[in-house]
C-alpha cells in the first residue's frame, strides 16, 4: 500500500503504549493468558485501549491522547487497576520489565492475528524470541517536516531513553550483564536500527516508495526503527524503551520525551546532520550494556563523558519546558533516578541477589507493578 498522508495532530500531545508480561501464580513463568484476560475485561470501561500482542503471554495497554504528565499517569493507573482486578480470578499476575527473567522462548504461542501469523512464518523463531516488552511513546508533530526534524534531533537522546527505562538484565535465567538486553532481540530484525537520514516528507515518501517497490516492505509497520514516523497519527514513535516496572516511571519517561520535544521544536538548538549517526551505535550500545553508568560521546563535539552527566545537563535545559507543560514532578523523578543510579535493571538484579530466586523476583515485580507491598506466593 502507498504511504498514507501525514495526519493533522496537536503538537506535543502524546500517547504511551506498554507491553506487559502475563505470568501464572504457580511459578511465575509466562502464561498464555491474553485471550482470557481480555475476556474478563470485556465491558469494563477504561481509558485508552488494551489489546493482544505477538505472543499469548503478552498484552499491550495504550493511553488515549494526553496533554500532560498527570493525564497520562492517571490513564495508566486506571488501566493498570482494572487489569489487576480482572487478573485475580484467573490466578494471573501482571508485571513490567523488558524481558521475563527465565522464560524459554520455544514455549511461546503466537497470537491468532493474521499479521502475527505472517510475521511468524516470515521470521521463524525470531517471532517467538520477540516475547520482549517495550514502552513506546507517540509525540504529536505540527507538520510532516517537523516530524522528521524531531526524529533525527531526538536520535542524539536515544541513549537517555534506553538508560532511564532499562529493565531487562536477565534472559532465559542468565544475567546478561546488560541493563537492556531486550533491544538485542529487536536488532535481529532486518528493518531495525535507525531511520534513513532524510529531512523532508517528500524525500521520505520517495524512500518509502522505493522500498515498497522492492517488495521488502508493505507498510510503515514493517520498519522496526528506534524512532519512526507514524503518519496515520501525525506523530513520531519512540520505540527504544523497556517497559518500566511501574506506571510512574513510564509516565516520567514519556514526560521527559515531551519536554525534550518542546525544547527541540521551539529552540531549534541544532540542525541534525548525517554525522550525528557516527557515534549512534556506540552510544546506543553503552546505554543498553551499562545503563545509567554508561558513557556518551557527544555527536557534535566528539567529547566523551558519562551518560548520566549528559542526562542531568539536558534536564537543566528542559526545566522551563517541563514547567510550561506542568511536568516538573516528572523531570524531578528523572533527575532522582539518574543521581541515585536507581534503574529498574538494578532493582531486578538486587532482588535476585537477595532472594537467589528468579521466580520470587518476578513475584515481587508483580507486586511492584500492582503497587502493593506483596502478593501471594
Curated annotation (Swiss-Prot):
Keywords: ATP-binding, Ligase, Nucleotide-binding. GO terms for biological process: modified amino acid biosynthetic process. GO terms for molecular function: ATP binding; glutamate-cysteine ligase activity. It holds the Pfam family GCS2. Its EC number is 6.3.2.2. It catalyses: L-cysteine + L-glutamate + ATP = gamma-L-glutamyl-L-cysteine + ADP + phosphate + H(+). Transmembrane segments: none annotated. ATP-dependent carboxylate-amine ligase which exhibits weak glutamate--cysteine ligase activity. Belongs to the glutamate--cysteine ligase type 2 family. YbdK subfamily. NCBIfam families: gshA_cyan_rel, PRK13516.1. This is Putative glutamate--cysteine ligase 2. It comes from Ralstonia nicotianae (strain ATCC BAA-1114 / GMI1000).
Amino acid at each position: 500500500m502507498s504511504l498514507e498522508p501525514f495526519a493533522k495532530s496537536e503538537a506535543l500531545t502524546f500517547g504511551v503504549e506498554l507491553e506487559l508480561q502475563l505470568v501464572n501464580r504457580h511459578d511465575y513463568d509466562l502464561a498464555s493468558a491474553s485471550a482470557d484476560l481480555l475476556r474478563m475485561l470485556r465491558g469494563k470501561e477504561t481509558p485508552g485501549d488494551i489489546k493482544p500482542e505477538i505472543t499469548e503471554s503478552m498484552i499491550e495497554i495504550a493511553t488515549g491522547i494526553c496533554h500532560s504528565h498527570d493525564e497520562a499517569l492517571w490513564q495508566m493507573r486506571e488501566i493498570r487497576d482494572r487489569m489487576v482486578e480482572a487478573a485475580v480470578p484467573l490466578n494471573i499476575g501482571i508485571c513490567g520489565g523488558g524481558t521475563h527473567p527465565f522464560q524459554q522462548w520455544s514455549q511461546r504461542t503466537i497470537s491468532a492475528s493474521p499479521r502475527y501469523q505472517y510475521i511468524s512464518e516470515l521470521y521463524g523463531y525470531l517471532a517467538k524470541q520477540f516475547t520482549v516488552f517495550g514502552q513506546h511513546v507517540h509525540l504529536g508533530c505540527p507538520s510532516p517536516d517537523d516530524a522528521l526534524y524531531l526524529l533525527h534531533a531526538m536520535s542524539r537522546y536515544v541513549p537517555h531513553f534506553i538508560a532511564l527505562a532499562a529493565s531487562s538484565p536477565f534472559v532465559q535465567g542468565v544475567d546478561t550483564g546488560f541493563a537492556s538486553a531486550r533491544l538485542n532481540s529487536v536488532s535481529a530484525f532486518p528493518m531495525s536500527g535507525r531511520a534513513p537520514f532524510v529531512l523532508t516528507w517528500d524525500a521520505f515518501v520517495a524512500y518509502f516508495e522505493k522500498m515498497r517497490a522492492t517488495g521488502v516492505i508493505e507498510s510503515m509497520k514493517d520498519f522496526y526503527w528506534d524512532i519512526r514516523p507514524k503518519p496515520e497519527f501525525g506523530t513520531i514513535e519512540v520505540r527504544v524503551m523497556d517497559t518500566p516496572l511501574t506506571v510512574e516511571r513510564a509516565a516520567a519517561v514519556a514526560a521527559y520525551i515531551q519536554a525534550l520535544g518542546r525544547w527541540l521544536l521551539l529552540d531549534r538548538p541544532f540542525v541534525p546532520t548525517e554525522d550525528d549517526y557516527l557515534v549512534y551505535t556506540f552510544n546506543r550500545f553503552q546505554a543498553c550494556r551499562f545503563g545509567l553508568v554508561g558513557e556518551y560521546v557527544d555527536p557534535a563535539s566528539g567529547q566523551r563523558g558519562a551518560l548520566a552527566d549528559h542526562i542531568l545537563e539536558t534536564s537543566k535545559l528542559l526545566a522551563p519546558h517541563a514547567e510550561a507543560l506542568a511536568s516538573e514532578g516528572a523531570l524531578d523523578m528523572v533527575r532522582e533516578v539518574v543521581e541515585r543510579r536507581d534503574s529498574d535493571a538494578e532493582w531486578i538484579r538486587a532482588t535476585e541477589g537477595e532472594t537467589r530466586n528468579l521466580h520470587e523476583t518476578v513475584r515481587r515485580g508483580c507486586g511492584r507493578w500492582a503497587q502493593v507491598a506483596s502478593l501471594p506466593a
